[in-house]
Amino acid sequence: MMTNLLLDITSATIDWSRAQFALTAIYHWLFVPLTLGLAVIMGIAETCYYRNNKPFWKHVTRFWQKLFGVNFAMGVATGIILEFEFGTNWSNYSWFVGDVFGAPLAIEGILAFFMESTFVAVMFFGWDKVSRGFHLASTWLTGLGATISAWWILVANAWMQYPVGQEFNPDTMRFEMTSFMDVALSPFAINKFTHTVTSSWIIGATFVVAVSCWYLLKKRETQLAKASIKMGAGVGLIATLLAAMTGDSSAYQVAQVQPMKLAAMEALYNGGNGESLTAIAAVHPFQQPDYENEQEPAMRIAIPNMLSFLATRTADGYVPGVNDIIKGYTHEDGTREPSVQEKIARGKKAIVALKTYRETKAKDQLPILRENMKYFGYGYIKDAKELVPSIPICFYAFRLMVGVGSLLILFFALSLFLVYKKEIAQYRWFLISAIIMIPLAYIASESGWIVAEIGRQPWTIQDLLPVSAAISDIEAGSVATTFFIFLALFTTMLAVEISILVKQIKKGPEYE
């Protein structure tokens, strides 16, 4: 299997495989955050029912559980396909790091998924069959299981962005885990988990508030709608504030371990001390800018020193730009970051040493391999420009995420004010705006993932394995065919989900 890492794969195969994985991931992420968010709302509603034993809260809980169930099933279906793609389209990746990457996914499948499967059955079919306390526990444990599932998947993703706790074994040609705790509890994983889960709560909260506002527009289910707005807006406001805090921590981590991603997010071509944070700028949306010759984007409006503060926690800290990273630069602590050409040379040394050791078992190659293994992936890079991700996509996706996220803070705060201090049903403009917030919240969430994944290109595993070496040696035509099959399948699934959700929302809660 390892020999495939040394073959040339056509660019068409790489592009179609990337497109297929992106398609599956984007569709999967339409379902997952709503599942995580609705789980919190269900838990709060049923806790109210458990405490006061009022049938009203039971109806509220069961109504949101019904919508949760539809979405949960779709999320499971798309998630299974996503995991299979690692073996079909990315077999070299699976072979190279399967011992490390597979561990969190195995735990997710054995622990979290079975936990969800067990308690979701009790949650749906255990009403009036088990005690109220056990049913409440089942509802919360269903949400906890989904959250634990997200934890292990995000641990795996974080490891790809910041690989720690592993060592390369030249005899097996694979990375092997040396510290499970380093992988599971890396700062990158913790930040990614907290930011992703809080953003999921935001989507669930937005959905609940929007559906409730639709009822108020139709002058239906007024009591349920107002109670749900209080829950949803409360959860949403807390979640947006937490997402802002965890987003700041995530950006700091990116600055430390993925400086090229940060440079692309900011369209920062030439770095320096006391760098400003770009609020808006004119970056061509459809072509890579001439970062080698341009000083900065046109029509740039920026906040002085803010980027340095976010990236280094000091107002005059040094932040490298795209050109600095390519040419090499000096860190604040005085250590030197090699140029891309130096890294490529060292990466090629590592590959040659590995091939020689594999063919001859010459032990004198092992010190050379160990010395240069840090830059192993650079040995596959032909041109420094390959290391610069799409600046327009990263730049605008990041601003979409932050802009809509800021709008959501105001939205939830206004929701709470109107539902507690005013007669919210009288503000028709707000009720309509709430419905519009559903696609905006999804755009913000998907934009965050686009920044995270596009921003680390060309790496499958940061610095260790580029996309071009992680791919399976398969025909581009077969991948293209399955791409369109999946596109049709996922679009149909999404249409079915929306249709069922709309039907159930129009039907409303079922009163006993």
How would you describe each model-predicted region?
Residues M2-E512:
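Polytopic transmembrane helical bundles with strong interfacial aromatic enrichment
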